Every structure is written in C-alpha cells, then in structure tokens.
Amino acid sequence: MLSLEGVDLRGKKVLLRPDINSPLDPQSKEIVNDERIVKTIPVIQMLLKGGASVAIIAHQGDTLDYQNLTDLSKHAQKISEYLDHPVEYLDDVCGPAAVQRVKALKPGEIVILGNLRYLTEEVSTFERDVKLDAAAYTKTWEVRNLAPLFDLYVNEAFSAAHRNSPSMVAFQELLPTYAGPLLFQEYEALSKILHGAQKPAVFVLGGAKISDAFGMMKPVLENGTADKILTSGVTGLVMLIAAGINVGEKTVRFLKDKDLLGFVEDSKEYLKNYPDKIMMPVDVAIEENGKRVEIDIDEMPKDTLYLDIGAKTVAAYREV
C-alpha cells in the first residue's frame, strides 16, 4: 500500500474515493452527522495544496435500505464549507456530462460526481449476485469512462474497503494508486490488532453489516488473535440460530430477506471449533406497547424482532 505523502501532484487530475456516507434525517433528508465528511477534509486539502484537480466519487445510502439514498449535493455543500473553497456538484457519475466536466478540470478545482449507488454496477445486489473480480470490473461502464481521464486514484474509504465494487477495486488495476492518510492510519491500526500486537484482545461484533463482522471473525479466530468475541445485533442473532436457539419465524424471515442465512453455517463451524471464545446474548430487549421490555432468550416471542441486547448480556460482557 503506497502512501500519498511525497507524491508529485502538480497539474494532476486525481480521482478520490472517500466514504462520506452519512446518516440523514428521515423526513428532511438533511445530514445529521457529518463526521465522515469532516474526516475527508485533510486528504482534499493535501491534494489541493499539491496543485491537483479533484473529482470525488462516493456513495450515500444503500439499495437494501432506500431511506438514506439521496444525491450528494448536500455533501458537496458541507465539504465546501469546511474547506472554505468552491466545490461543484454534478448529478452524473460517468455519463457524458461527467466526462466533459472532468476533462475540463483545472488545478484547484473540485467536483463531486453523482451518487455511486445510482449505478447498477455499484449496488449491493450486483456485488452479491454477479461477483466479478477486479480485472472484470475494469470493463464496467463506470471504470471504462472514468479511468482514462485521471492521472492517479486515491482511496480514502477504509470503512467501505470490504466492498467488492468497481469504485473500490478496479481503478487501481489501471491507475497509479495511493492510500489517503486516513485509510493508511486505519489500515496500520487494524494490522496491529489482527496480528495480535496487544493482548488480551476482545472483539465486539454487532450491527447490521454482518459481512464485516464475519470477515473479521474468521482470521482472528484462526490465528489466535481473539481471546473473546462478544456478539450482538444481527451477528448475535445468526450466532443464536447456529447454536440451535429458536428465535422465531419473523427473525428468520428477516434474515432470509436480507440474504444473511448463509452465515449460519459459518457460525456453526466457529461455535464448534472455538466454543470458549464466542459469547452470545443471553437476554434481549423488545418493544411492547411502545415500551422497552427485556426478556431472556428462551422467552423471546416468536413473532417479534429484538431491538437490543439486555442488561444481563451487558453485565456478562462487562465481566470479560
């Protein structure tokens, strides 16, 4: 992985891929937390200071959950405010308008192209069902149209690094590629964790993106890095099913609709091979009449989804 530090950027056209995917207000669609946008500012400043012109490609929301799927005009406005520098938004990713604008970019100019998730080639179902490798992705419309316009590609999207999509894996096949300072920093920190630099090591894996959790679980169990793995969220649900716990038809249907039941077999293997290292929820919180109610796992109603781990689980995890 090559660092951007010291690279001659004078007069170069740079394709920057950050992760500025942000939570939005459900009604107004205003950005309610711009932390990821703020973290992108240093690499943009570095590129501008070096004399480059910058085109940004990024995503907002996901086709598995359309609530946060919007254009990037408000992201452009935020970046402009933090930089105190003009940032243009163009509602096109790789069509004629985008190509024409990128060709005309001058040093010091910044343009944010349209939401990548509006492209079929970048959506989750395409990534999951088609399963192309990096070389094949170079033949996508997005990469064929954009790659010839740039001198180099900078990846600053560590939080999206698990994605097998053209914007994440294909441009480095065709362009000189560098890691932005944030990606480089986070990569080094993760490398230390994965290689057991600090002991004891406890991993807390939860949330809805269980591909991330299971992607990390396998190596840290196999190489002995993890002393304990505490599961919650959807990851915890899958583990409970693998352990033979009846979590109800509604939960199973939810996991099936999200195409997540495939992780159950992996979970069974991990529980068999590492029974003392993996902890699962012993109680959960559900909603009853608009109120939070905590119940043991074996008492969980079969027609509801759990919202959170319960106090008993929290207490058990604190003891680790």
Please annotate each region the language model reported.
Residues 1-320:
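Active-site loop-to-helix "anion-binding N-cap" substructures in soluble metabolic enzymes
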